[in-house]
A protein has these predicted regions:
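Assembly/interface hotspot detector across virion components, adhesins/toxins, and nucleic-acid enzymes
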Residues: 6, 182-185, 306
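Conserved active-site aspartate in kinases
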Residues: 268
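A boundary/linker detector
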Residues: 136-157, 161-239, 260-263, 338, ...
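Short cysteine-rich clusters marking metal-coordination/redox-active sites
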Residues: 253-256, 294
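A detector for short metal-coordination/catalytic motifs
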Residues: 231-242, 248-249, 264, 272-365
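Extended, solvent-exposed segments with strong compositional bias
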Residues: 97, 104-158
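Short, flexible coil/linker elements and helix-boundary hinge sites characteristic
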Residues: 111, 129, 215-216, 246, ...
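OB-fold ssDNA-binding interfaces and closely related basic DNA-contact patches used
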Residues: 1-122
């Protein structure tokens, strides 16, 4: 158990004993107001979680401790057997973070929807803010294809209000569901019943910190061609100086120990686009706003799978498997102090923890 990743939920500590990641939010599942223009229909309330036959079926059965997938007919009629009773939950914190990440897509819409979804954003935000508890529990039941259906698709559904809420706020194709299976580190009253933590995330390129519309808005339409070219040239010079100073200050990737300059990336802590959008060009080229990392670890940091404390301790998120962490040569429980020279980087690191890191930082610190 000690090798399992740990997480804090509502003041209690849990082991993450298993997870299902990257369950795409299909348009067929989406509440009708948020559906893409290319699709028709009102959407269905059941969520596809994979095939229930073969190795994937065995994994689903083990994960949910449920083996009746598709075997739900009684006297020739569909029944709705419970998979988990009252021990699944969404967190208000995660739902708010999702809406924060999705706000540019809601307001400026890179995808083409049936409706102007910006008109719904404030109502959805109010709905989540009005939830009385951070943890919102619900039950799930089996609405899978019947056994005689060769597609053998496993579906789950809930009739609880929080299920209806997440269907309303989630955006199709660019969102995905993650489910963590948790058991408490300290067992009280012999209760070892697992909890299932449902979370929703947005594809990296559609998050508000890097959204395509954010990038386009940096270049103002009124700018003349010569001004755009001049600004582009100045920023390129600034980027070269930024990289040079970052690597001078931090000449080695703290993960791979590689110091070959050709292989190092000057990775922004507070994203470049955000600095420019806020009119903080000095932050965009401040070497203290950069870490020297080799490409794999740059990707982990840039897309919010890892972050750091103000003292330089590594914090690993919960969206990668134990197998992946092992291959990366990272122990997600170690909280290792990395050589990132954190002094005077605190404001940038704080921004990264709050807005770039994909998990809720309070679940770890």
């Amino acid at each position: 158990m000690e090798n399992l990743q740990q997480i804090h939920i509502d003041g209690k500590e849990y082991y993450i004993i298993d997870s299902i990641q990257n369950l795409r939010a299909e348009d067929s599942f989406i509440y009708n107001k948020n559906k893409l223009a290319m699709f028709d229909g009102a959407g269905e309330a059941r969520k596809y979680v994979g095939s229930y036959i073969g190795s994937n079926g065995s994994r689903l059965s083990d994960f949910f401790a449920y083996t009746r997938w598709g075997d739900t007919k009684i006297a020739g009629k569909r029944s709705y057997p419970t998979i988990q009773q009252g021990n699944c939950f969404f967190s208000k914190t995660n739902l708010l973070k999702y809406l924060f990440d999705a706000r540019v897509e809601y307001q400026q819409q890179e995808q083409i929807y049936h409706n102007d979804i910006s008109q719904y954003y404030d109502d959805y935000l109010h709905t989540i803010n009005s939830l009385s508890s951070d943890l919102n529990f619900f039950s799930i039941y089996d609405v899978s294809d019947f056994l005689e259906n060769k597609l053998s698709r496993a579906y789950i559904r809930s009739d609880d209000d929080i299920w209806k809420i997440w269907r309303k706020i989630v955006l199709p194709k660019i969102s995905y569901l993650s489910i963590l299976k948790l058991i408490p580190i300290k067992i009280n009253n012999g209760n070892t019943q697992p909890l299932f933590y449902f979370r929703i995330f947005l594809d990296y390129q559609f998050r508000s910190i890097v959204h395509p519309q954010l990038t386009q808005s940096i270049i103002q339409p009124s700018s003349t061609e010569s001004k755009v070219a001049e600004r582009s040239y100045n920023r390129r010079i600034g980027a070269d100086m930024f990289r040079k100073k970052v690597i001078e200050h931090m000449p080695q990737c703290p993960f791979s120990k590689i110091s070959e300059e050709k292989l190092l990336i000057a990775s922004h802590i507070k994203p470049y686009n955000i600095c420019i959008k806020e009119g903080q060009e000095d932050q965009a080229i401040d070497y203290l706003n950069g870490l020297a990392l080799t490409p794999t670890y740059d990707k982990l940091f840039d897309q919010g799978y890892i972050t750091f404390t103000d003292k330089g301790h590594l914090i690993c998120g919960t969206q990668l498997s134990a197998y992946t962490w092992e291959k990366l040569n990272i122990n997600p429980n170690a909280k290792s102090k990395m050589r990132i020279y954190p002094e005077d980087r605190e404001p940038y690191l704080d921004y990264h923890r709050r807005f770039v890191f994909q998990d809720n930082i309070d679940d770890f610190v």
